[in-house]
Swiss-Prot record:
An example Gene Ontology CC term for this record: cytoplasm
Species assigned in the record: Carboxydothermus hydrogenoformans (strain ATCC BAA-161 / DSM 6008 / Z-2901)
PANTHER family xrefs: MITOCHONDRIAL RIBOSOME RECYCLING FACTOR PSEUDO 1, RIBOSOME RECYCLING FACTOR
Name of the protein this chain belongs to: Ribosome-recycling factor
Cellular localisation: Cytoplasm
Length: 185
């Protein structure tokens, strides 16, 4: 019983880490990566589609992204979607591809990005703590229903706490790496 609860809690905590990694990957840090455009959604023939489903995205240079749509008719829609996004990058359309020159970050923008990264890390920590609370509640319910002994319940809660500490530490490490990346460019 407790092992099932622990396994489920671990899976959920791992998902929270994966979400944080994705969030960090889409943050613009002055280096061109196709992941920057993951959240950009294009209105194409009346449907909302991610850019990566309409085009090939490559980074031929550290500060340049090239978007090559499979259908040239999508160029305008992709350009409009990038302009509407919160990336703060102006696309250049040459009729066959869209180029995104990634400008170097100002010190102010770096500080903003660090704040955003910290906020996202805190959201991940809160999610992990909520998972801990749910797991502990389930263990207490088993204890209350006399399915497990008090000692087993205590051991189970200790295991949940160890899991929580491990995943919170991972969040802190990811945040530290992201802050270093943002501030070092």
């Amino acid at each position: 019983m407790i092992q099932d609860i622990l396994k489920e809690a671990q899976d959920h905590m791992q998902k929270a880490i994966e979400v944080l990694k994705k969030e960090f990957a889409t943050m613009r840090v002055g280096r061109a990566t196709p992941a920057l455009l993951e959240k950009v959604v294009v209105e194409y023939y009346g449907t909302q589609m991610p850019v990566n489903q309409l085009a090939t995205i490559s980074a031929p240079e550290p500060r340049l992204l090239v978007i090559q749509p499979w259908d040239k008719g999508a160029l305008g829609a992709i350009e409009k979607a990038i302009l509407k996004s919160d990336l703060g990058i102006t696309p250049t359309n040459d009729g066959s591809v869209i180029r995104l020159a990634i400008p170097p970050l100002t010190q102010e923008r770096r500080q903003e990005l660090v704040k955003v990264a910290r906020k996202k890390a805190e959201e991940a920590r809160v999610a992990i703590r909520n998972i801990r609370r749910d797991a502990n509640d389930r263990i207490k319910d088993l204890e209350k229903d006399k399915v497990i002994s008090e000692d087993e319940g205590k051991r189970g809660q200790d295991e949940v706490q160890k899991l929580t500490d491990k995943f919170i530490k991972t969040v802190d490490e990811l945040l530290k790496a992201k802050e270093d990346e943002i501030l070092s460019i």
